[in-house]
């Protein structure tokens, strides 16, 4: 019987990781890691918009795709297994990572009209930059 393998993906606070594991005994054959190009955005958005106040912990969803395009091929190459023998993928994100999307599942921050709007970007678990409500109108 041919051996089968799975890919494990972990998106952390500063980087993404992939492993290739043997389905039969869980042995990890290879792993790959790549840091996010934008890291955690706590002072500025990619377009230079300053994040005023404190508690910002934002990420760029493009980083998740860039990481994915690197770590999977790298881990598969290191493992020496054939991609046809990989039968599943498991995915994990850090705690409660919030990604606002539109009705077509496009991240709001990737729409031109929202690039300078901090609340359109991915919110990390440690984000505390919510705007305080000063007036309530009923």
Model features per residue range: what roles?
Residues 1-111, 136:
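N-terminal glycine/serine-rich phosphate-binding loop of ATP-dependent small-molecule kinases
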Residues 109-123:
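A mobile, often basic/glycine-rich helix-loop segment
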Residues 119-135:
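Glycine-rich phosphate-binding loop plus the immediately following alpha-helix
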């Amino acid at each position: 019987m041919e051996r089968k393998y799975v890919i494990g993906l972990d998106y952390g606070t500063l980087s993404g990781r992939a492993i290739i594991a043997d389905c039969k005994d869980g042995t990890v054959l290879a792993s790959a890691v790549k840091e996010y190009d934008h890291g955690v955005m706590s002072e500025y958005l990619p377009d230079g918009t300053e994040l005023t106040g404190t508690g910002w912990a934002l990420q760029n969803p493009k980083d998740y795709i860039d990481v994915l395009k690197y770590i999977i091929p790298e881990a598969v190459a290191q493992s020496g297994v054939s991609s046809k023998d990989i039968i599943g993928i498991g995915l994990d994100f850090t705690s409660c990572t919030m990604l606002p999307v539109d009705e077509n599942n496009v991240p709001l921050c990737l729409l031109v009209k929202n690039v300078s709007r901090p609340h359109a970007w991915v919110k990390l678990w440690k984000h505390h930059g919510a705007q305080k409500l000063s007036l309530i109108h009923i």
